[in-house]
Amino acid sequence: MPRDFSRTERVGDQIQRELAELIRMELKDPRVGMVTLAGVEVSRDLAHAKVWFTVLGSEQQIADTTEGLQRAAGFLRRELGRRMRLRTVPHLHFQYDDTQEKGARLSALIDKAVAEDRAQHPDDDEDRS
């Protein structure tokens, strides 16, 4: 059964595709390097769009990239308006997506807890076999 997509999801997907191309091809800011757009959440009235992105690097590189994207938001919005047929083009708000880092931290904590449990109860592994 096909999934029903709301208009905001379709617009968000289109904005993500267009922004990815614009950032890669048109944006000349040296602070914005290898950026991956993780997702776009568009408000119901299509007035605002949160653009989630990831970038490899240090905290300083992340801050620089965020600033570069925020400063380019007007240019990117104007270019989106030229490429998409929308009555109003959403204002762009860029947010760093740290879910991968949080997931890696949680995974490491789980691995550590399992290793500690096995170290405290080594005979339990033999009983399960």
Curated annotation (Swiss-Prot):
PROSITE patterns: RBFA. Coiled coil: none annotated. It comes from the Bacteria. One of its GO terms (cellular component) is cytosol. GO terms for molecular function: ribosomal small subunit binding. Its main location: cytoplasm. Gene3D superfamilies: 3.30.300.20. Keywords: Cytoplasm, Ribosome biogenesis. One of its GO terms (biological process) is maturation of SSU-rRNA. Belongs to the RbfA family. Monomer. Binds 30S ribosomal subunits, but not 50S ribosomal subunits or 70S ribosomes. One of several proteins that assist in the late maturation steps of the functional core of the 30S ribosomal subunit. Associates with free 30S ribosomal subunits (but not with 30S subunits that are part of 70S ribosomes or polysomes). Required for efficient processing of 16S rRNA. May interact with the 5'-terminal helix region of 16S rRNA. This is Ribosome-binding factor A. It comes from Thioalkalivibrio sulfidiphilus (strain HL-EbGR7). The lineage of its organism: Bacteria, Pseudomonadati, Pseudomonadota, Gammaproteobacteria, Chromatiales.
